[in-house]
């Protein structure tokens, strides 16, 4: 799929796919279970299945990406960071700027992952 046509849901579904792949290898790894629940919650908010946005402020996907997966599973860290980026904008009631769109904060974060 062309990055320019990506939607917030594409980022979330991709993250869930990666998490489920990791869970198939390590089914009892609790961090993957926590990440999956949090990403699924963001998906449910985005689709309207869940209307309670109060938990968006309590998500720790970004911290999980940086502290737990950045050095051991860069792909999963990138996906969690993308979902965290989307969720943090949703929590603030902002129009969501997707990670691939030109945004200085996103570009800084991507440089950090490449180095």
Regions found by a protein language model. Name each.
Residues 18-70:
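Amphipathic alpha-helical interaction modules
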Residues 6, 10-13, 33, 37-40, ...:
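Generic structural signal for well-ordered, non-transmembrane alpha-helical segments
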Residues 1-36, 107-114:
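Short terminal alpha-helical segments
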Residues 2, 7, 30, 52, ...:
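Serine/threonine-rich low-complexity intrinsically disordered regions
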